[in-house]
Amino acid sequence: MEALVYTFLLIGTLVVIFFAIFFRDPPRIVKK
């Protein structure tokens, strides 16, 4: 059960970092 919690926290941290970088530096691939 603890492993599931740690995995959830790890994925959540990675997602937060990903979105922080994504919104800070707009992707050059998608041009609107």
UniProtKB/Swiss-Prot annotation:
Keyword Translocase: no
Localization (cell): Plastid, Chloroplast thylakoid membrane
Transmembrane regions listed in the UniProt entry: 3-23
GO BP annotation list: photosynthesis
Signal peptide residue numbers: none
Keyword Oxidoreductase: no
Alphabetized UniProt keyword annotations: Chloroplast, Membrane, Photosynthesis, Photosystem II, Plastid, Thylakoid, Transmembrane, Transmembrane helix
Pfam family, one: PsbT
GO CC annotations on file: chloroplast thylakoid membrane; photosystem II reaction center
Coiled-coil zones: none
Domain of life: Eukaryota
Membrane topology classification: Single-pass membrane protein
Entry similarity comment: Belongs to the PsbT family.
Record note on quaternary structure: PSII is composed of 1 copy each of membrane proteins PsbA, PsbB, PsbC, PsbD, PsbE, PsbF, PsbH, PsbI, PsbJ, PsbK, PsbL, PsbM, PsbT, PsbX, PsbY, PsbZ, Psb30/Ycf12, at least 3 peripheral proteins of the oxygen-evolving complex and a large number of cofactors. It forms dimeric complexes.
Function (record text): Found at the monomer-monomer interface of the photosystem II (PS II) dimer, plays a role in assembly and dimerization of PSII. PSII is a light-driven water plastoquinone oxidoreductase, using light energy to abstract electrons from H(2)O, generating a proton gradient subsequently used for ATP formation.
PANTHER family per UniProt: PHOTOSYSTEM II REACTION CENTER PROTEIN T, PTHR36411
Protein name per the record: Photosystem II reaction center protein T
